[in-house]
A protein has these predicted regions:
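Signature of alpha-helical transmembrane segments and their immediate interfacial
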Residues: 1-37, 433, 499-548, 575, ...
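Transmembrane helices with small-residue packing motifs
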Residues: 15-16, 23-57, 119-128, 380, ...
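Flexible hinge/switch segments at interdomain interfaces of large molecular machines
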Residues: 37-48, 85-91, 128-151, 179-185, ...
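Solvent-exposed, membrane-proximal periplasmic/extracellular interface segments of envelope transport
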Residues: 4-6, 61-137, 195-216, 237, ...
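Helix-loop junctions and hydrophobic alpha-helical segments within the transmembrane domains
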Residues: 323, 330, 334, 409, ...
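Hydrophobic transmembrane alpha-helices and their membrane-interface caps
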Residues: 30-34, 346-413, 471, 867-954, ...
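Transmembrane alpha-helices and their membrane-interface boundaries in multi-pass membrane transporters
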Residues: 398-412, 434-453, 460-499, 618, ...
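Extracytoplasmic/periplasmic membrane-proximal domains and adjacent transmembrane bundles
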Residues: 9, 51, 122, 168-346, ...
Length: 1016
């Protein structure tokens, strides 16, 4: 490198270098202890949820009158990807998903636009629709969850204690929000005997009117004096059960209290709403979310202190137990990865001492903490937390960051062995290595560009990978220029008068012969390498496909779905039976149950499901990952045996963006009937695939309904109408909300119903008396034809089309992604080709996300290739040399694919990233070799000798750096997330380095027609 020799400058100003070394190490240690901690990196969930309810409407009616107009309006959302909706009897849930290309800085603007669109449509919805409501905080993570339990305590007592705790936890540092779970709403029921009501000549509507008037909050005005304003407050609101009982009722000349003629009781709502249990005990949950930028470990300690205070104040028998403890999980995860990082440092240092010798190894060992600490400073500056990706990336970069230092140290050592003094050796190392090392470093960093600049949720999840590794590589180059020469000048030792040839030992002689053979038979070597490469690429379809593996976390997410239309009471009984079976099983440490609802998002990689009475969810926490699978399998077997009508599915937490089922295929069509028909055919074909299990559709079977065809003429003659009859039936069967009671911070509905009628059986429906006006009651069967039918109770839609998802699980050794590809490309190929126009079958779930992510990952690849070629061109200055170096890039695929194939590791996101980056590292080695050939030619050597001696001279540093790179990856092998990358890197780099050292000379000699001596 021409110009100022920075190595010489550093040696002459080593006190300045020492100062910065101390400053960097000090700043790095401070940064490390002040970095945020989390288990997984944050990524933006670009989804908002719109909900609405229309009591009494069927799924078909609410789809047509509410879901469809809202979806059409929401199609105007800027940056919209797709809309998915779930419509059930009386309610609809619409998921608005934005494109991954929408910057997270614009998300709040998009949510505001969605609110405006929904508000614009609100006035056009039918009267009686409640909502729509918008939840744009769907990505809130409640990492710390507690359960308040206690035998002998009512739900209301537990709620009050939980509410007090909630208020105190809200003030804890780093707490963003605290929510209560499993709270049972109370309701006041005013029940009257139907005959007694008739004897007073009263109609239900008369009672409604009195309760509504008495319970309404109305302003009574304000008196304005000269000095102040005085508000008038009217007492007598219905704020207690006693005040309701004392409510005066006047019928004609008779007066009495409501409590004299009606039963007034306050109880929990019937039927119950979503329920929570912990270890089988009824519970009220307290869910805590962390503020943005907070530290999980600090939050965990603060919460622990506050909860201990609360426990000491609770009455005997009431307990607070921890359900989810994300700070503890983060602490364990950080500890494991920090241990792996230290292991990698020790391994790399040991390899350095063995390969370079003690004194040279000392130099390298001192360079490592400087670069690592500088990386911590960069991470703190950029706001990159410590998590699975950033720590794993540091381990990955650890092997790479020593490459430049090894090259400089090895070159100084060689020059000292050749007789140069220390300063001259450092100057020669800088002159010969600085520029090619910089080019190689930039090329290696460029290999990771697709990760740093790809769009999409997955790329956002692993985005820190590029920034951490690129900064570490550049910092390592700076350290090799300034720190390595100074430390080498101080520590490297060579025995006085000792001069060793670089070709002295046996390894060099063997390598010399191999190079000579490759040059002699260069065409054979080139063709053979191309054939091996082609054969390896042909193996790709036989390598398992899995974009992100399951994590080692002990949680099992168990979803249990009863037949559509099942009551929450039945779901509760089934979940209680499962809990009884788990109680006492020492393989599990705890389990929390959610009936009629889903667990909150306790980690970012978990998607809550829409509430449904027929659905129950259980989060089982196994004692450790070793017994996790057996606990899952035994629980599923128990459910299949004891509850054959229930459909159970257990999944583990993945190490990437989640999917509900491992295998998902989505069928969309024009109308509900045909879509359901084709989906059943597809599901039957999927079920026939070998090893498939638990195949189901998210479109449940039809549910029974009672249809009443009212005789309009007869009803009108009797003084009634459809509305009055519907309301009367609602009063009898469910209870009609007529007013509200204000009790502290609780709003308790007041409902009116007739005594005993809630227990009516279907068989008695025709004889059920209904009010038709003027105090008259007639049997329902006299004014209506009663029929029993089945109807679709749930409708899923995607982009306005009815959509059914076929789900399942793969058995055997094949990964779910591999099975989906085979199902789609082979099993269902003929089925897809014969679908009518307007009907499509698409991949869904994890593989859809993975294919989309691969497309995003591929988008920046042309930029990556251009930058690599540009750097090559500036460094080598000749197009033929650029082509030779570029050709070697794909050679890394040979070892990478073979390693994945032989070890049965899946090809997924991180392994694809590894292969892209591997190409940059292989090209880097080629640059070093080609640059050395150019230097030897400039020194006047013959072309053949220049090639041979350059390969031999660079053999040691290239192999040393590759071996240390490989050893640096070893601590990543135990991690399911990083294992595919580590395996592909280890195999790919070792084989590519060996092949590159032989193929590059052969390519060079073939192009430039360099021939060696015949005797060689």
């Amino acid at each position: 490198m021409k110009g100022l020799n920075l190595a010489e400058w550093a040696i002459r100003h080593k006190q300045i270098v020492y100062f910065f070394i101390i400053a960097i190490i000090t700043g790095g240690l401070w940064s490390y202890f002040h970095l945020g901690r989390s288990e997984d990196p944050d990524f933006t969930i670009r989804q908002a949820v719109v909900t609405a309810a229309w009591p009494g409407a069927s799924a078909q009616q609410i789809t047509q009158q509410v879901t469809d107009p809202l979806e059409k309006k929401l199609q105007d959302t800027k940056g919209l990807d797709y809309i998915k909706s779930f419509t059930h009897d009386g309610k609809t849930v619409i998921y608005v998903n934005l494109k991954d290309s929408v910057p997270k800085e614009e998300m709040q603007t998009r949510w505001h636009e969605i609110r405006n669109l929904v508000n614009d449509e609100w006035g056009s919805l039918p009267s009686g629709v409640m909502g729509p409501y918008i939840n744009d905080r769907f990505d809130d993570v409640y990492g710390s969850i507690y359960a308040v339990t206690g035998d002998g305590f009512s739900y209301e007592e537990k709620r009050k204690y939980a509410e007090n705790i909630r208020r105190r936890l809200t003030g804890v540092e780093d707490v963003q929000k605290v929510e209560l779970l499993g709270v049972q709403k109370q309701e006041i029921y005013v029940e009257m005997d139907q005959n007694k009501l008739a004897s007073f000549g009263m109609r239900p509507s008369d009672v409604f009117a009195m309760l509504q008037q008495q319970g309404a909050m109305m302003p009574a005005g304000m008196i304005h004096t000269d000095s102040r304003n005085v508000a008038i407050r009217v007492e007598g609101l219905l704020d207690t059960v006693e005040s309701l009982k004392e409510l005066p009722i006047h019928v004609g000349e008779r007066s009495f209290h409501l409590g004299d003629v009606a039963s007034v009781t306050q109880m929990y709502a019937d039927p119950e709403t979503s329920l929570m249990y912990f270890n089988g005990k009824p519970a009220v949950g307290i869910a805590v979310s962390m503020a943005p930028g907070g530290n999980n470990l600090v939050l965990g300690k603060n919460l622990e202190k506050e909860i201990e205070k609360e426990k000491s104040e609770l009455p005997a028998g009431l307990d607070i137990e921890q359900v989810a403890d994300q700070p503890s999980v983060v602490n364990d995860s950080i500890h494991e990865f920090t241990k792996s990082l230290l292991e990698a440092i020790v391994i790399v240092m040991a390899a350095s001492f063995l390969s370079l010798g003690f004194w040279s190894g000392i130099v390298l060992a001192l360079c490592i903490p400087v670069v690592v600490c500088a990386s911590f400073i960069y991470m703190k500056w950029q706001g990159i937390d410590l998590h699975i990706v950033s720590l794993g990336t540091l381990i990955v970069s650890l092997g790479l960051l020593v490459d430049d230092a090894i090259i400089v140290i090895e070159m100084m050592q060689v020059k000292l062995e050749e007789g140069m003094d220390r300063l001259a050796a450092a100057q020669a190392a800088y002159k010969g290595c600085a520029k090619p090392m910089l080019a190689g470093t930039l090329i290696t960093a460029a290999g990771f560009i697709p990760v740093g600049f790809a769009a999409g949720q997955t790329a956002e999840y692993v985005g820190a990978f590029f920034w951490v590794i690129a900064s570490t590589l550049l910092l390592s180059w700076v350290a090799s220029i300034f720190v390595s020469p100074v430390l080498g000048y101080r520590f490297i030792r060579v025995k006085a008068g000792e001069k060793k040839s670089a070709f002295a030992d046996r390894a060099y002689r063997l390598f010399y012969k191999a190079i000579a053979w490759c040059i002699r038979f260069k065409k054979t070597v080139i063709i053979g390498t191309a054939a091996i490469f082609a054969g390896t690429v042909a193996l790709i379809p036989f390598v398992n496909q899995e974009f992100f593996p399951d994590s080692v976390r002990p949680e099992i997410i168990l979803d249990v779905n009863l037949p559509s239309g099942a009551s929450i009471k039945e779901t509760k009984e089934v979940m209680a039976g499962i809990a009884d079976n788990l109680y006492g099983d020492n393989r599990g440490s705890s389990f929390s149950t959610y009936v009629g609802d889903s667990a909150p998002r306790f980690i970012l990689l978990f998607d809550p499901l829409a509430p449904e009475d027929s659905h129950g969810q259980m989060i089982l926490v196994a004692r450790d990952s070793k017994v996790r699978d057996s606990l899952r399998d035994d629980t599923l077997a128990f459910i299949a045996e004891q509850y054959p009508d229930a459909r159970a599915h257990a999944r583990l937490i993945t190490t990437g963006p989640p999917a509900e089922y491992p295998i998902m295929l989505r069928l969309s069509g024009k109308n509900v009937e045909d879509t359901a028909k084709f989906a059943k055919e597809a599901a039957a074909l999927v079920s026939q695939y070998p090893g498939m299990k638990n195949v189901s559709m998210d479109w449940p079977e039809e549910t029974p309904v009672v249809r009443l065809k009212i005789d309009q003429d007869k009803v009108r003659k009797l003084g009634g109408d459809n509305y009055s009859i519907s309301r009367d039936l609602y009063v009898k069967l469910s209870g009609y909300k007529v007013a509200e009671s204000y009790q502290g911070n609780q709003l308790v509905p007041i409902s009116f119903r007739l005594e005993g009628s809630n227990a009516a059986r279907l068989a008695d429906l025709s004889s059920l008396p209904v009010h038709v006006g003027s105090g008259r009651y007639v049997p329902l069967g006299e004014i209506a034809d009663i029929s029993y039918e089945n109807e679709t109770s749930t409708i899923w839609r995607r982009d306005l089309h009815p959509t059914i998802t076929i789900r399942g699980e793969a058995g055997g050794d094949k990964t779910a992604d591999s099975v989906v590809n085979e199902l789609y490309d082979r099993t269902l190929k003929d089925f897809r080709e014969h679908l009518p126009d307007g009907y499509t079958l698409e991949k869904g779930g994890a593989i859809e996300n993975s294919e989309k992510s691969v497309q995003y990952l591929a988008a920046p690849v042309p930029i990556m290739i251009f930058l690599i070629l540009m750097i090559l061109m500036f460094e080598l200055d000749k197009i033929p040399l650029m082509v030779i170096a570029g050709i070697t890039g794909p050679l890394g695929l040979i070892g990478a694919i073979l390693s994945l194939f032989l070890t049965r590791q899946p090809m997924g996101f991180v392994s694809i990233v590894g292969m892209l980056a591997l190409s940059g590292m292989v090209v880097r080695n080629s640059i070093i070799l080609l640059d050395q050939i150019r230097q030897h030619l400039a020194d006047g050597k013959k072309p053949y000798d220049a090639v041979i001696e350059s390969a031999a001279l660079r053999f040691r540093p290239i192999m040393l750096s590759s071996v240390t790179d490989v050893l640096g990856f070893v601590p990543l092998i135990p991690s399911p997330f990083w294992r595919p990358l580590a395996v592909s890197f280890i195999g790919g780099l070792l084989l590519a380095t060996a092949i590159g050292l032989l193929v590059v000379p052969a390519l060079y000699c073939w192009y430039y027609k360099v021939e060696g001596p015949k005797a060689s």
